[in-house]
């Protein structure tokens, strides 16, 4: 499967846009799969007793997060190899804000295992992201609860995605998630993968 990694800060709308990507490709009869990187990491974290949920997982030591990243990359690469023709999209983050600094979400040991065609940076105005975060009561994102922190994280994500693309030989594409119409970003992602 051709792989696209869709990154973005928590609250930017990755899951919503990727659901729209899936809907569009399904309607076109194109084989596709959406994988959430955090789901793979969380399954291992739960099994090892590292964390009880995603928000707790973000606060783990860098060493533990690296182990979880490696295990997830191997599992996702295997799914891509077994998937046949079509598209595999990975919902993840280019950087993770931790108590000890920004942890690259796609370091060399992850990006070379997955080997994507495109790394997408899904972005939106920090005010819009903050508003979306406040509406999502299912998550605890108080570590991203300030516009300046959101902007800083977006900038670090751009740097990290570019560095990862160099290692994988993939392209990087910034896509704006327009408020109220995720199909605009979804169609742009699909066009970039063809």
Curated annotation (Swiss-Prot):
It holds the Pfam family AAA_17. It is an enzyme of class 2 (transferase). The keyword Transit peptide does not apply. One of its GO terms (molecular function) is adenylate kinase activity. Signal peptide: none annotated. It catalyses: AMP + ATP = 2 ADP. Its main location: cytoplasm. The keyword Magnesium does not apply. Its EC number is 2.7.4.3. It comes from the Archaea. ATP binds at residues 8-16. One of its GO terms (cellular component) is cytoplasm. InterPro entries: Adenylate_kinase_AdkA, P-loop_NTPase. Keywords: ATP-binding, Cytoplasm, Kinase, Nucleotide-binding, Transferase. It is found in: Cytoplasm. NCBIfam families: PRK04040.1. Homotrimer. Belongs to the archaeal adenylate kinase family. This is Adenylate kinase. It comes from Sulfolobus acidocaldarius (strain ATCC 33909 / DSM 639 / JCM 8929 / NBRC 15157 / NCIMB 11770). The gene is adkA.
